[in-house]
């Protein structure tokens, strides 16, 4: 049975309203920080009522978690998808690191949420951040695990530690150079690849 056109129009309006709220929240959380941003700031920027905000989110933190899950999840998905196209472990590691760095520079607002604003915010947000980072770290660890038997560089590396080290170093370097200009994404990615995927 077909959905009535009036219902489709209503659903489209609701989705546009949610999108305006999410876009406003992302810009404010990234630009001003989570702590300084209020629900009033978000609804003012999105040009919606407070009740519209609460139609979608229980709280400012719930909005932040949803945004981090959607946007951070999409970024990590892109990283893993790009890495999977590599022909060997070196290429997969390089592609993953490069995609993460370039994506963070292209979407610095999302990078700020994932790397800066989510740290220590709450137990739930921290758990989500760790879950997103773990997807990247686990993929790196898996590459190292397979490379240990035939690549001298990786033979003495603990895969889990190496995976976390890559995520930590790459995230920290991106966070630093997003706020201290002077290095472009490609140069930073190349330098990190020399360290972790020589």
Please place each PLM-identified region on the residue numbering.
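Short secondary-structure transition hinges
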Residues: 95, 102, 106-141, 152-153, ...
């Amino acid at each position: 049975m077909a959905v009535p056109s009036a219902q489709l129009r209503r659903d489209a309006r609701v989705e546009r309203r949610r999108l305006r709220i999410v876009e406003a929240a992302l810009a404010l959380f990234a630009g001003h920080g989570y702590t300084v941003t209020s629900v009033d700031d978000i609804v003012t920027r999105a040009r919606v009522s407070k009740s519209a905000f609460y139609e979608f989110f229980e709280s400012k933190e719930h909005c932040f978690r949803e945004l981090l899950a959607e946007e951070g999840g999409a970024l990590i998905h892109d990283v893993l998808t790009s890495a999977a196209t590599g022909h060997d472990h070196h290429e997969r590691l390089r592609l993953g690191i490069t995609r993460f760095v370039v994506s963070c520079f292209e979407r610095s607002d999302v990078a700020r949420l994932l790397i800066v604003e989510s740290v220590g915010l709450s137990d739930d947000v921290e758990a989500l951040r760790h879950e997103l980072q773990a997807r990247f770290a686990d993929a790196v660890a898996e590459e190292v695990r397979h490379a240990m038997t035939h690549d001298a560089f990786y033979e003495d590396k603990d895969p889990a530690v190496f995976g976390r080290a890559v995520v930590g170093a790459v995230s920290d370097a991106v966070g630093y150079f997003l706020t201290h200009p002077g290095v472009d994404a490609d140069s930073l990615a190349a330098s990190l690849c020399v360290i972790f995927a020589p």
